[in-house]
Structures are given as C-alpha cells and as structure tokens.
Amino acid sequence: MTQTKINADAIRAMKVRGEKIAALTAYDFPMAKLLDEAGIPIILVGDSLGMVVLGYPDTTHVTMAEMEHHVRAAARAKPCALLGADMPYRSYETPETAVKNAKRLAAVGAEFVKAEGGREIIGQVRAIITAGIPFCGHLGMLPQHVLEEGGKYHIKGRDDAGRMKLFDDAAALADAGAFAIVLEIVTPPVAKELTKALSIPTIGIGSGQDCDGQILVTPDLIGMFPWFTPRFVKPKVYCAAEIKSAVAAWKNFVQSPGGAQ
C-alpha cells in the first residue's frame, strides 16, 4: 500500500488527533529506508552523527559539510516520512547565516531544520520560516552547549527559574511559527505542563512519557553504540553484539579447514 507523504502540517494534526509521534534518527540511505518502511513519521538527520558515526566527543565538532553529506544520503531513500536536519554548531548565529545554512540543508533534501535555543534565536527562527523552510525547536538540555555547562548534561526545569524560562522559550518558538519542539531531558512534570500548554507538538527525549511524541538516537534504540547508552534508553535489540557474533562466526569459518565463501 502506498504511503502518503508526510509534511509539517500532518505532524501538527497528529497532536490534534491525540496520536503519538514517533521520531528517530538516520544518517544514511539504508537506515532512512528501513525507518520509513517501518512507518516512522519523522526522520531526523541529527548532529548526533558526530558522536555515533564520526567518533567526535560531542556534537560541537560537526560541520555543515558533514551534515550536507549525511542529509543527501538519507534523502536518497525518498522517504514518505518528514525528513529533517539539525543545524550544526555555530551555523545559525545570525538570521542571515541561519537562512543561508538552512537553505543549504534544504537543497540536499532536508524538509525541515532544527536548531537549539529559545528566545535568543527567535530572529533566526523567523527568518528561516519566512524563507519557506519549516522549523522545529529544541529546548531543555542543549547538546551544542555542553562545553558551556562544563561538559555535563544537566536536567532542565528543576527550579522555578528554569521552568519559567522553558515556558517563555516554548511560547516564543510557537509564536514564531515552529511546527514542533523537541524537549530534551526536561523534568517530566514540566514537560507534561508544556505539552498541555502548547498548541504545537512536543517531542520528548528523556523527558517522560507525557509529551506528544518521542525521539531517540537510533543507534541507542538498537544497541548499535555499546560504548555509551543514555540512562533513559532501553535498547530493543543489541545489534552490536549480534554483529560481533556474526563476524566471529564468519572468521572461524574462513580459518577452518576448507573454509571459503
């Protein structure tokens, strides 16, 4: 059965219907194809690729050229899912650079872009949307700011000041025209309040089960990056172990008398 192409309006409509939104990351053609065939409505080419694909210590090392390369690969899957891309570190410091770089990502297949921050980037958000590119916000723990926070990932919304900032930033993003907001490592009660208060979908990661949807880094979900797994992730399968087992079995076969393939 042919699937219908999903756009930002369809994602907003899912919140209206009370339908939970499942989103995952892909960094290449085969994973984008598999996720699309599994019916995932949002596929994000995340800057998490810096850590789980390129071996960087954090996402601040990812470049625009690297994002373009991986978006182009994922876009070749021609997914029915809405395909988005993270704007990498320092690629949206002014409205002008934000639009220029969002257009670069759109040119290689991104159907929306996501950037970290709230009221402080509203000028950039408005400029991107005015340029005709759908925008998804990202609040809570901001991986691109990890070095500014001493290299630690901190839970957000624990105190009144943090809660008020989240509400202010979320309202600003919604007013600017964002079609959805990712909430990363926000205290579940605050994430639940934000979800009820906003007319646009919230997509949680490590923020409890009361958001309008959930997103995970796919290698975390499938146990493909065993060297680090966030505490809030429970892998559904352990692909890394399966790969090592298969490789070891093949190696033994090759090295056995008469082994060939």
Walk through the language-model features, giving the residues of each.
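Alpha/beta enzyme core
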Residues: T2-Q261
